[in-house]
Amino acid sequence: MRTTYIAKPGEVERKWYVVDAKDVPMGRLASAVASILRGKNKPTFTPHVDTGDYVIVINAAQVKLTGKKASQKMYYRHSNYPGGLKQRTAGDFLAKEPEKLLETAIKGMLPHNSLGHKQGLKLHVYAGEDHKHAAQNPEVLDITNLI
């Protein structure tokens, strides 16, 4: 009898990838990175097992916002106090916290459950070129052929 392969958590081999976000549209980058974090690029992908790889995103401050998103796209948060609604544009968000902007976009494309949270922990975003994961020997991934 033939059965579908189901990955087991102990059998998963993980790689480390470095992705350069310079001049790449934010949504397309986020979609490709989320797919790698989930493991959908592997033939052993199993929906209920974390089969994804680690991803390091560098140059987050130079990611491209297309159209008028820098001035018109709004991000909201609330302090749970009356009148505590805070809002800012994507351009302000990119100028002040580029790492958090990209993390928000990528994690929004992961499952919203405990498995998605575990997959999100394998994401590391840096505003500049430097990162502290050289010991893992990350492989440079050209994202332009994935988008």
Swiss-Prot record:
GO BP terms in the entry: negative regulation of translation; translation
Function: This protein is one of the early assembly proteins of the 50S ribosomal subunit, although it is not seen to bind rRNA by itself. It is important during the early stages of 50S assembly.
Gene this chain is encoded by: rplM
Keywords linked to the UniProt accession: Ribonucleoprotein, Ribosomal protein
GO molecular function: mRNA binding; structural constituent of ribosome
Keyword Ribonucleoprotein tagged: yes
Assembly mode: Part of the 50S ribosomal subunit.
NCBIfam families: rplM_bact (TIGR01066)
Family the UniProt entry places it in: Belongs to the universal ribosomal protein uL13 family.
Listed PROSITE patterns: RIBOSOMAL_L13
Official protein name in the record: Large ribosomal subunit protein uL13
GO cellular component: cytosolic large ribosomal subunit
